[in-house]
Structure formats: structure tokens, C-alpha cells
């Protein structure tokens, strides 16, 4: 399975949401 890394990105000091990035090893 591919590990999923969750990045919490903040834009303008506000939470823009959670981005799910799938890294293919």
C-alpha cells in the first residue's frame, strides 16, 4: 500500500484544509 502523508497547510493565517499526498515508494 502507498503511505499517505497529511499536510496541514495554512494560507493567510487561516487553515486552508488538509491535503492528502500519496507517496509512491
From Swiss-Prot:
Induction: In seeds, induced by jasmonate. GO terms for molecular function: toxin activity. SBTX is known to be glycosylated but it is not known which one of its two subunits is modified; contains 5% carbohydrates. The keyword Disulfide bond applies. Expressed in seeds, leaves, roots and stem (at protein level). Keywords: Antimicrobial, Disulfide bond, Fungicide, Plant defense, Toxin. Disulfide bonds: none annotated. GO terms for biological process: defense response to fungus; killing of cells of another organism. Activity decreases below pH 5.5 and above pH 8.0. Involved in plant defense. Inhibits spore germination in C.sojina, A.niger (at concentrations >50 ug/ml) and P.herguei but not in F.oxysporum and F.solani. Does not inhibit vegetative mycelial growth. Inhibits growth of C.albicans and K.marxiannus but not P.membranifaciens or C.parapsilosis. Probably acts by affecting the cell membrane. Does not have urease, chitinase, beta-1,3-glucanase or hemagglutination activities. Does not inhibit trypsin. Injection into mice produces toxic effects such as dyspnea, tonic-clonic convulsion and death. Heterodimer of a 27 kDa subunit and a 17 kDa subunit; disulfide-linked. This is Soybean toxin 17 kDa chain. It comes from Glycine max (Soybean).
Amino acid at each position: 500500500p502507498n503511505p499517505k502523508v497529511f499536510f496541514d497547510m495554512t494560507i493567510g493565517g487561516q487553515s486552508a484544509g488538509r491535503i492528502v499526498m500519496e507517496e509512491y515508494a
